[in-house]
């Protein structure tokens, strides 16, 4: 599938899903799952004020929804290639989603009570990440995901699993 190599992905409806091998050993216990990515809404050409409710799910469990304020083209993205039209989406917001043993948050703000136990990481060979626009979303403003070659942050989607051992 070509999407794993994409540096810019956008859609107005639906979701994208990634399956990542779960390498937890039997003596390791998840303490925190963190995802970092640069995202924005999606609008034909661009619109800095275009809210979109972006829902994150892990292993089939919706963990929370972030409302992106817009799809930005007011200034050129630091990494956005010169060949990309300056009127199109240029950059997003760098977001940090964290799931702990107590709840889920984004950038230090609580999103939901979903916790690591709910995700059943110990019993799954994969960690399945879904990012998208829910069918019942209030703000259906699409989604843009920026990889390491677009936007302002030189990174792809990063997923880190912190664990303890016994």
Question: What is each stretch, according to the model?
Answer:
Residues 30-33, 85-86, 116-136:
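Noncatalytic modules at the cell exterior or secretory-pathway interfaces
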Residues 2-9, 69-122, 139-141:
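Extended, solvent-exposed segments with strong compositional bias
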Residues 132-166:
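Proprotein-processing/basic-patch segments
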Residues 37, 99, 143-145:
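Hydrophobic transmembrane signal anchors and adjacent membrane-proximal interface regions, especially
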Residues 1-86:
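Mid-protein regulatory/catalytic core that forms ligand/cofactor-binding pockets
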Residues 30-31, 94, 157-160:
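Generic hydrophobic, helix-prone segments enriched in Leu/Val/Ile
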Residues 26-29, 96, 153:
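Histidine (H) residue identity feature
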